C-alpha cells in the first residue's frame, strides 16, 4: 500500500486529506501515481499544476522519484510565508 496525503489548498479542493492506494509495478514513480490520480478527472486536475510539490517518506523530491510498497507520498502547493 501507498499512503497518499494532500495538504493545504489541495486538501481543501479535493475534500480529502489522504488515502491508501494499493501499490503495483505500474506505480513505479510519483509521476505515475500523479497520472493515476489525474485520470479521476474533475477536482483532481489540481494536481496537474506546474508548481506542485511532493515528498516521499517525508523528504522533498521530484516527480521522477521511484515508489515502493509502503511509501508515504505527500502532495502540496508551494509554501509561502510572511
Language model features by range: what are they?
Residues 1-81:
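Ubiquitin-like/PB1-type beta-grasp interaction modules and other compact soluble beta-rich domains
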Amino acid at each position: 500500500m501507498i499512503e497518499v496525503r494532500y495538504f493545504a489548498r489541495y486538501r481543501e479542493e479535493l475534500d480529502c486529506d489522504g488515502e491508501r492506494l494499493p501499490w503495483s509495478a505500474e506505480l513505479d514513480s510519483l509521476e505515475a501515481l500523479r497520472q493515476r490520480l489525474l485520470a479521476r478527472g474533475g477536482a483532481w486536475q489540481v494536481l496537474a499544476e506546474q508548481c506542485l510539490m511532493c515528498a516521499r517518506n517525508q523528504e522533498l523530491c521530484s516527480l521522477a522519484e521511484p515508489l515502493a510498497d509502503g511509501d508515504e507520498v505527500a502532495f502540496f502547493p508551494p509554501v509561502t510565508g510572511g
